Amino acid sequence: MRRLACYASSSRSELHSGRSRASRRDHGLIFYDKIPEGDANPEEVIWASRDAATRLHRLVDRFAGITYLVVDDADEASLAVGAIEELDGLSLATLLDAVAVDPKAARDLTVIAALGVLAPPSFEPRVFDEFSRLLADEEPAIRARTISAIACPSWPEFVPLLEAMASDDPHDEVRSRASVALAAFLQHLSGAT
């Protein structure tokens, strides 16, 4: 599965209805299932190819404040490009290019969440550098939100940053959040559940 696009909160109403443009155009996909939002999961709408080899998932994550698409298929690329364009989505490459041009844009809480959701499972230096910069931001709310966002990729490279924040951050809540995240990271990286 690959997370491929995020949508700002303002796009949520069109996507939340389940009647987005992607559902009206065929793309070889048909409605498969809708999973309502619960305490442990976001709302999810799933479309599948007629042979069930491809599935496109749209998740409305109220905790992160974003809506995003996930595709699972051997031929993700063509579906990904079409879905991103049709729904006016934001890919990781586009997001990184935008924050390179305007670094202040990365301080938006929705952008921080999108970076976390779109970060690949394997280490990506540009994303790591952006997160490192945000973890050092002067604003405690930005650092705290970034700690939540880095849980999505859970790269071991974050451990030293979390250790430093858990012991040295000037803000109590950020230190506390870093301690909790560090414990979760270490448990995840050790293979424990």
Identify the meaning behind each predicted range.
Residues 1-60:
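Short Lys/Arg-enriched alpha/beta "domain-start" segment
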Residues 101-112, 136:
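HEAT-repeat alpha-solenoid elements in large eukaryotic scaffold proteins
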Residues 103-104, 138-139, 170-175:
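Short inter-helical turns and helix N-cap capping residues of alpha-solenoid HEAT/ARM repeat scaffolds
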Residues 37-105:
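Surface-facing alpha-helical segments and adjacent helix-coil boundary elements at the starts of domains
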Residues 89-100, 121-134, 156-167, 190-193:
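Amphipathic alpha-helical scaffolding segments comprising HEAT/armadillo-like alpha-solenoid repeats
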Residues 151, 166-170:
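Amphipathic alpha-helical interaction elements
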Residues 68-86, 109-122, 143-155, 176-189:
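Structural detector for internal amphipathic alpha-helices that build alpha-solenoid repeat scaffolds
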